[in-house]
């Protein structure tokens, strides 16, 4: 199958994918409505027992560490806050609509654990560099940045397995180039297409599309820069490299755009190590 035919097949397959659960789309609309309140949001969540149970599970997880058990859904929503409940609804909805079939050697658990780690890193960087109001859409972006891999795993497992086999012998940064050569597009573009179909904001879908591309400083945005940096920090192996002090040219551009240096990156590496248990706890709560 030539690349043009394969690309068209990808577009048609994405059109066949299910939409987000109706509860999630209803909640997203409520979160955008300034007239919404905790009672309205809780009422919608109650109609989806699975979502309600997972929100309670997160509220009682080690990730938050509340001193008393929380059994009332409305109280859980109040304690977690609208932004976190929105992130949870999206997280759970995406995993429900697009479960990894593990047709290739890619591990669905490993993929989503990495995505949760990047999400938590991006939110923390957003809080440190900007402000709390910016942080939740960064969490969602981090969570969904590799969703295109699940599309490949579901519908193009044979081609994607070839990618994975070849990528084992190259630098991780070359993965998207191998995808482009063997599949026709990379997982960022596939993910961006899916998120556009699901009506996610363009700042999220466009950032997902280009997060592995080599970009000039004129093409960088805050979201893409934080995503690139969060992805690298998540993968960085402190067992082999004790500190981050020699960024390549592209990451140098990202650090310059964000107006941070090696010290900030090493602080975020320390943060990543400090929240490992919380990352696992959060993943287990929503999975």
For every predicted segment, state its role:
Residues 1-146, 150-162, 168-171, 175-248, ...:
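Conserved alpha-helical "signature site"
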Residues 1-9, 252-287:
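Terminal helices and disordered tails flanking the catalytic cores of nucleotide-processing hydrolases
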């Amino acid at each position: 199958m030539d690349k043009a035919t394969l690309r068209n097949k990808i577009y048609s397959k994405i059109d066949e994918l299910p939409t987000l659960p109706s509860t999630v789309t209803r909640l997203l609309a409520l979160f955008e409505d300034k007239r919404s309140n905790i009672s309205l949001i809780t009422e919608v969540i109650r109609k989806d027992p699975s979502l309600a149970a997972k929100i309670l599970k997160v509220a009682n997880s080690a990730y938050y560490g509340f001193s008393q058990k929380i059994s009332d859904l409305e109280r859980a929503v109040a304690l977690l806050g609208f932004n976190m409940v929105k992130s949870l609804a999206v997280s759970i909805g995406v995993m429900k609509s697009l479960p990894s079939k593990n047709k290739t050697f890619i591990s669905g658990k490993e993929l989503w654990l990495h995505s949760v780690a990047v999400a938590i890193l991006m939110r923390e960087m957003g809080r440190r560099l900007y402000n709390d109001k910016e942080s939740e859409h960064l969490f969602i972006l981090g969570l969904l940045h590799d969703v295109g891999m699940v599309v490949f795993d579901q519908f193009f497992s044979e081609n994607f397995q070839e990618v994975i086999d070849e990528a084992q012998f190259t630098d991780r940064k070359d993965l998207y180039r191998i995808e482009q050569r063997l599949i026709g597009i990379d997982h960022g573009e596939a993910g961006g297409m899916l998120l556009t179909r699901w009506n996610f904001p363009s700042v999220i879908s466009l950032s997902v599309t280009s997060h592995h591309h080599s970009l000039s400083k004129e093409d960088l945005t805050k979201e893409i820069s934080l995503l690139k940096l969060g992805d690298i920090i998540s993968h960085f192996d402190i067992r082999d490299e004790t500190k981050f002090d020699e960024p390549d040219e592209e990451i140098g551009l990202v650090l310059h755009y964000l107006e941070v240096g090696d010290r900030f990156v090493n602080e975020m590496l320390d943060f990543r190590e400090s929240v490992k248990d919380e990352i696992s706890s959060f993943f287990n709560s929503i999975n």
